[in-house]
């Protein structure tokens, strides 16, 4: 980048939606010495699309047991998916008013990519997704960042053996996005201590 603070001041606030797109576009642009102009995303109240496109990745739920015992208003506790915004999104169910709320978006930024398909890793390619012309022409094509398969599993509980807690795990591959796989401990209770882990 032309300015060393672009990652911190422009790209990460854009990716994490912690900054306003209009402010980022106006403040951190080619005209002010930054490497690119940033894309404005839809902000109307009727448009709730806060995730990248989900292609080939599953949307799965886990946690809370197979019966109504441990479920949250009849739902599994966690909902997970991966998207081409370069993130694995983890949602947690709390109540009926908001069935699932986004709790964490994990970016496997160091995963290596084929250099002919964008940046050398996921972190570098995020900048392309933020470009104002992303997906609009051959110079700024759509990028696959995470579109591999994902699987969720829950550990067994065995009170008699002293295993007092269950944990939920996610395993995924990068698909066309990069070479690699990842595993996340989503949440649950420690196997020995019974203390909350992950999103719990």
Model regions and ranges:
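A fold-level detector for beta-propeller and closely related beta-sheet-rich head/sensor domains
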Residues: 1-200
């Amino acid at each position: 980048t032309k300015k060393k603070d672009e990652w911190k001041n422009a790209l990460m606030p854009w990716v994490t939606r912690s900054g306003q797109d209009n402010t980022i576009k106006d403040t951190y642009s080619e005209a002010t010495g930054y490497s690119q102009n940033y894309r404005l995303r839809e902000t109307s109240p009727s448009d709730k699309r806060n995730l990248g496109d989900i292609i080939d990745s599953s949307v799965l739920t886990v946690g809370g047991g197979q019966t109504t015992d441990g479920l949250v208003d009849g739902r599994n506790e966690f909902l997970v998916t991966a998207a081409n915004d370069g993130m694995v999104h983890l949602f947690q169910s709390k109540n009926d008013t908001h069935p699932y709320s986004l709790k964490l978006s994990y970016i496997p930024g160091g995963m290596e990519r084929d250099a002919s398909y964008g940046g050398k890793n996921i972190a570098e390619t995020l900048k392309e997704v933020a470009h104002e012309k992303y997906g609009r022409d051959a110079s700024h094509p759509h990028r696959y960042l995470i579109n591999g398969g994902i699987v969720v599993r829950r550990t067994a509980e065995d009170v008699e053996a002293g295993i007092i807690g269950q944990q939920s795990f996610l395993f995924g591959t990068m698909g066309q996005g990069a070479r690699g796989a990842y595993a996340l401990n989503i949440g649950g209770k420690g196997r020995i201590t019974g203390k909350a882990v992950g999103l719990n």
